[in-house]
């Protein structure tokens, strides 16, 4: 649970930060002091952009929390990330799930092609 506390604190945080050339805006449970979770999710999004759209240049990410609640005592957060890459916008469903060790597992799914 200790590792998940920064994730919960970030829920209320409206953040704008950058990593390399990517500008992040909006609200996300992945934003935190070290952004490790955000960067892990972004790696999967980058892979999806390269595989689906042959694009390796992510310009910006805008995130929105759709829901955050506990299931069996563990947090689950659902977000939508709108990714601008190579002049196009694509949306991804991001799922964040607290595991038994207090760490966070995640899923990334392209909403539509």
Q: Where are each of the predicted segments found?
A:
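Sec-dependent bacterial lipoprotein signal peptides
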Residues: 1-17
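Cysteine-centric segments in proteins
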Residues: 17-113
């Amino acid at each position: 649970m200790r590792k998940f506390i920064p994730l919960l604190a970030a829920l209320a945080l409206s953040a704008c930060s950058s990593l390399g050339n990517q500008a992040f805006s909006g609200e996300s449970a992945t934003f935190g002091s070290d952004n490790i979770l955000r960067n892990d999710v972004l790696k999967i999004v980058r892979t999806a952009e390269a595989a689906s759209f042959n694009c390796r240049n992510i310009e910006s990410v805008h995130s929105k929390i759709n829901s955050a609640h506990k299931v069996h005592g563990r947090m689950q957060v659902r977000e939508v990330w709108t990714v601008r890459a190579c002049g196009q916008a694509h949306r991804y469903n991001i799922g964040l799930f607290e595991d038994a060790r207090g760490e966070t597992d995640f899923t990334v799914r392209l909403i539509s092609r």
